[in-house]
Structures are given as structure tokens and as C-alpha cells.
A protein has these predicted regions:
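Long, hydrophobic N-terminal alpha-helical segment
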Residues: 1-49
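Residue-level detector of functional hotspots within protein domains
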Residues: 6, 59, 71, 92-94
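A generic "functional-site adjacency" signal
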Residues: 13-14, 74, 102
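Amphipathic alpha-helical coiled-coil segments and their boundaries
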Residues: 13-16, 23, 30, 55, ...
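Short acidic/polar alpha-helix capping motifs at helix-coil junctions
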Residues: 39-44, 57-60, 70-72
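Heptad-repeat coiled-coil alpha-helices
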Residues: 43, 47-50, 54-57, 82, ...
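Charged, well-structured alpha/beta interaction segments
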Residues: 61-85
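Glycine-rich, aromatic-bearing surface loops/beta-hairpins
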Residues: 78, 82-134
Length: 134
């Protein structure tokens, strides 16, 4: 009679290097969009703050732009969440993909300026624990 060991992983989805690699064009596009939206939101918030400081009505175009940018950002972030892909540093474009390497749950680690997925790290070691993929 055999003994079966059932491993409970933290994440439901685990990416192979190839699966993560295939998503990079879309991930790059989303990272660029998120950074643009973050900058736009900052500008809109500064404008709205100035308007409220002056006692002006904050309705109108600026509020509409802010709401649209926020909704677009939330939509993109929902795509990351749905796929269980994690943005670790938006400004750097640092992204982690859950994976299994040698029966261990780890993250494949990628930055937006890297041409391909080449590194991994333990779940709790972060970027400083990056190692080349085997």
C-alpha cells in the first residue's frame, strides 16, 4: 500500500517558463498603461486638489477623466489578479509568476526591460533572492 503525499500550494495557477514568456507582450503593454494611468491620476488629483482649495466646483471634465483613468487601471489590475500574476514594483515593471521548480512553489521573476523570463526566487525571498532558471 502506497503513501500519497498531497502538497497544498499557496497558488492555484503555476506558470511554466514558456507560459510566462508567451504573456510578456501583453504584460509589457499593461505595465506601460498602468504607469501612464498612474501619472495621469496624479495630475488629475493635483488639479482637483487645487480646485477644492480655491473653493471651485470639482465636477466636470477633470473628475470624469479621473474616474475613467481609475476604472481603466482597475480593469488592468483585475487581469493580473485573475491570472495570479503579481506586480512587485510598478515603476520598475517587476512582475512575479507563481511556478513549480523541483517540486517547490516559487516565483518566476521578470522585469519589463528584460527580453525573456530568466530568473526565479523563493516565495518569501523577493528580488534579492533571484537566481538564474535551471
Amino acid at each position: 500500500m502506497g503513501f500519497f503525499r498531497f502538497v497544498k500550494y499557496k497558488f492555484e495557477k503555476h506558470y511554466t517558463r514558456n507560459e510566462a514568456q508567451q504573456l510578456l507582450p501583453q504584460i509589457r503593454e499593461w505595465i506601460v498603461a498602468l504607469n501612464r494611468l498612474r501619472e495621469n491620476l496624479g495630475r488629475y488629483e493635483t488639479r482637483l486638489h487645487g480646485m477644492t482649495e480655491q473653493g471651485l466646483d470639482v465636477g466636470g471634465n477633470t473628475v470624469n477623466q479621473w474616474i475613467r483613468a481609475l476604472a481603466e487601471m482597475q480593469g488592468i489590475l483585475a487581469e493580473f489578479q485573475r491570472r495570479q500574476i503579481f506586480i512587485k514594483d510598478l515603476a520598475r515593471g517587476l512582475v512575479d509568476f507563481p511556478a513549480i521548480i523541483n517540486s517547490r512553489e516559487v516565483f518566476l521573476c521578470w522585469e519589463v526591460d528584460e527580453p525573456s523570463v530568466e530568473f526565479w526566487h523563493d516565495l518569501d525571498s523577493g528580488f534579492t533572492g533571484r537566481e538564474p532558471l535551471p
